[in-house]
Regions:
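Conserved P-loop/Walker A NTP-binding site and adjacent catalytic elements of P-loop NTPases
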Residues: 2-156, 163-165, 175-179, 185-190
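Canonical AAA+ ATPase core
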Residues: 170-172
Length: 190
């Protein structure tokens, strides 16, 4: 492990809202995935979606899914992707048997929250929201995402822990605190 990964794992494990800022391909995914998996195992009675991992594109979420699955499935943690390419049979299965970790994007979250679908009710059990590539959520898109996050906070029965990951974020702490509406700790990678 790199020093920043150890620090991030510790902070996320303690329940802190964390920004993981490190270069591309330096192990940011492991830095948030390992403590989330540990939390799921610790709360083994957990029913419903425990964590939502948001990626800016379907391609990136589909690329990350096998990597996340490799860690999770060995210890019985279910991980599913729900996006525009998820077929009706898979969608029904996700709604009827919610995974521990759900991989999606903000467009899907917005649509289902807005239309109050069965899928949106799955989100009420969420305890951790991970936003990868957080730097893309700036400008008008970022303000829309801020309001999606506010709606998520309203429907969740738990206080949500926020984790952001990015390789390139100018003034990352201020940016993420505005995006999520909470105080955040920053962990820097080399």
């Amino acid at each position: 492990f790199y020093k920043f990964q150890e620090e991030a794992i510790e902070e996320v494990s303690f329940g802190e809202n964390v920004i993981i800022e490190a270069p591309t391909a330096s192990g940011k995914t492991e830095a948030f995935l390992i403590p989330v998996i540990q939390k799921i195992k610790k709360e083994s009675s957990t029913k419903g979606v425990f964590a939502v991992f948001v990626y800016p594109t379907k391609a990136l979420s589909r690329d990350q899914h096998p990597k996340i699955l490799k860690f999770a499935e060995k210890i019985g943690i279910d991980v599913q992707v729900f996006d525009g390419d998820t077929n009706q049979v898979e969608r029904r299965e996700i709604v009827e048997n919610p995974p521990h970790i759900l991989i999606t994007n903000f467009d899907v979250l917005h649509y289902h929250l807005w239309h109050q679908t069965k899928f949106s009710s799955l989100l009420s059990t969420m305890k951790v929201l991970v936003v990868d590539e957080a730097h893309v959520y700036s400008g008008i898109f970022g303000s829309n995402v801020h309001y999606i996050i506010k709606r998520l906070k309203r429907i969740c029965s738990n206080k949500i822990q926020f984790v952001a990951a990015s390789a390139t974020l100018e003034d990352a702490k201020n940016f993420c605190e505005q995006l999520f509406g909470v105080k955040m700790k920053i962990v820097h990678g080399s």
